[in-house]
Swiss-Prot record:
This is Taste receptor type 2 member 140. Belongs to the G-protein coupled receptor T2R family. GO terms for cellular component: membrane. Its main location: membrane. PROSITE patterns: G_PROTEIN_RECEP_F1_2. The chain crosses the membrane at residues 10-30, 47-67, 88-108, 134-154, 186-206, 230-250, 265-285. Glycans are attached at residue 162. PANTHER family: TASTE RECEPTOR TYPE 2, TASTE RECEPTOR TYPE 2 MEMBER 14. It comes from the Eukaryota.
């Protein structure tokens, strides 16, 4: 039974890795090719491209940690390796979440309908708002990395070199929970920002629908459609991020779980659902990416049909 579960989780993990690499790679390639062709790189395309690249790095960071911990767990004993893995995972996770948050901020400022002077000022300076958000996030990243590295140095010094250590620092409670609590604390900030944006978008849509009812217009005007589309994107991000957040919290119980291989596969599968699933949503929600995806599907189908006709 355990072997069957491990095989199922491993297959799920492989599928998620493939989807994550192909989906995020597709987003980056399409936007870069469009930039090369048009010599124009819009703000939303810049955010999407940077997000896709960070997600690719995040997927590979999780895969690297899983492979090293299962095949060469002794490498994770050294302080240097601990710091490298923690720093790489923290940085890729940070940009993956904060760039998605910046995308939500962009949609909110472009679509929401408020007459407040502060909101209107931010709307006219959306690029500045996104840039400042990323700048502030870099300061938070610096603090996060400093805290994690300091705690790792202090914790490792207190233990012998022969301590038992495996995936995601799960055999030593003090060290294993350092990245858990610090990353959970710092990644909760963009989650709160996105949740606030979601609530404001709902309020903006409610006000807009109320205004349209007074004007006796249909509910599906362009502004309503844009609101609903933005809400779908934000809701999907919140849902996938919540799953990822719960996966981080689950790591706190890893020390009490005896079947650590199964648990690690479960954690990796849940964690990879965030960057892999969100890339598919971004492709389907963006008209340019969706059109490019449908073009590739049509080309593959035509090539397959042509190969069948040419075969004897």
């Amino acid at each position: 039974m355990k072997v069957t579960v491990e095989c199922a989780l491993l297959i799920t993990l492989i599928v998620e890795i493939i989807i994550g690499c192909l989906g995020n790679g597709f987003i980056a390639v399409v936007n870069i090719m469009d930039w090369t062709k048009r010599r124009r790189f819009s703000l939303v395309d810049q955010i999407l491209t940077a997000l896709a690249i960070s997600r690719l790095a995040f997927v590979w960071s999780l895969l690297t940690v899983l492979v090293i911990s299962e095949l060469h767990s002794s490498l994770l004993i050294t302080r240097k390796m601990l710091r490298i893995i923690n720093n790489f995972w923290t940085v890729t996770n940070h940009f993956s979440i904060w760039l998605a948050t910046c995308l939500s901020i962009f949609y909110f400022l472009k679509i929401a309908n408020f007459s407040n002077s502060i909101f209107l000022s931010l709307r006219w300076r959306v690029k500045t708002v996104v840039s400042l958000t990323l700048l502030v996030s870099l300061l938070l990243l610096l603090v996060n990395v400093i805290i994690i590295n300091t705690c790792i140095v202090i914790s490792v010094e207190g233990y012998k070199v022969n301590m038992s250590y495996s995936s995601h620092f799960n055999n030593n409670p003090q060290i294993s929970r350092i990245p858990l609590f610090t990353n959970t604390m710092f990644t909760f900030i963009p989650f709160t920002v996105t949740l606030t944006i979601f609530l404001l978008l709902i309020f903006s849509l409610w006000r807009h629908l109320k205004k349209m009812q007074h004007r006796a217009k249909g509910p599906r005007d362009p502004s309503t459609t844009a609101h609903i589309k933005a809400l779908q994107m934000v809701v999907t991000f919140l849902f996938l991020y919540t799953i990822f957040f719960l996966a981080l919290v689950m790591q706190a119980w890893n020390n009490e779980i005896q079947s650590k291989t199964v648990f690690n596969l479960v954690f990796e599968s849940i964690a990879l659902a965030f960057p892999s699933g969100h890339s598919c949503v971004l492709i389907l929600g963006n008209s340019k990416l969706r059109q490019a995806f449908l073009t590739i599907i049509w080309w593959l189908r035509s090539s397959f049909n042509a190969a069948e006709l040419s075969s004897p």
